[in-house]
Amino acid sequence: MINHFKAEFYKLRHSKILITILGVCAAVIMVSFALGDMTFFGAGDGTESVIGFQAKCYLSSEIPTFQTVARSSLAYTAFFWIIGILFATIFFTKEYNTGTIKLSVAYGTKRTILYYTKAITILVVSLITYLIFVATFFVIEIIQSGYIPTASEVINLLGWALACGTVLLALESISIFLCVVIQNTGIVTGICCLYVFSGASVYLMLWSDMETVSIPLKFFVYGNPMYYWMNFSSCRTMGIIEHLPFYFIGCISLLIVGGLIMIREEIK
């Protein structure tokens, strides 16, 4: 099993996918400098109650607070999730599209081993890259704002970043499952992007009155990554974090179902 993980990391290290992903992440960071102060998907009556994308929206440029620095550090998370979807779908389907996976199966490697080693490699690399992504923004915000965080504040930000990272793993589990079922990178990416951005639109309309909405809409909102990002990015966790384990377990279950489908699926 360890050799299979080594093989996956070797393929990733010697492919253009990782370089491309890192390049796109760097481009997003550069775009953040160009855009400056921004608030997307905002709603509410003032900065404290706004949900969603908030970049450099300081209540006071002279006396920045930890929450405003943390918001800016997490602001571009949704953009990274799209990058993560592209990475997961392209890297997972590459060997299927080229047909090279047949060689591994012909040499007696079990399909489930190939499936799970590739899936776990995607999830681990994505999580590490995302944490570096957030840390980079955090350092930039500290330098630009002059705010010096305490150790407990850094731990708080790490907790929010890990929560968003957990959502990323769940989202990529969905995309990997769809890759097994649909086997088309473009369609899978389109479905996942529609799933993400439709969640933002629906939640914006409902977020201030979630207690009265219908159960199907609640399932859609609580099962959408934008629900978590738009709250975590605004430092809102009360009543939000409780839904995350169910979302994560549900998506990981799809990943397991994908492995079962993989056993019976014909490799073309």
Which ranges hold each PLM region?
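Junction motif at the cytosolic side of a transmembrane helix
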Residues: 11, 248-268
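Secretory targeting signals
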Residues: 25-91, 115-183, 197-201, 208, ...
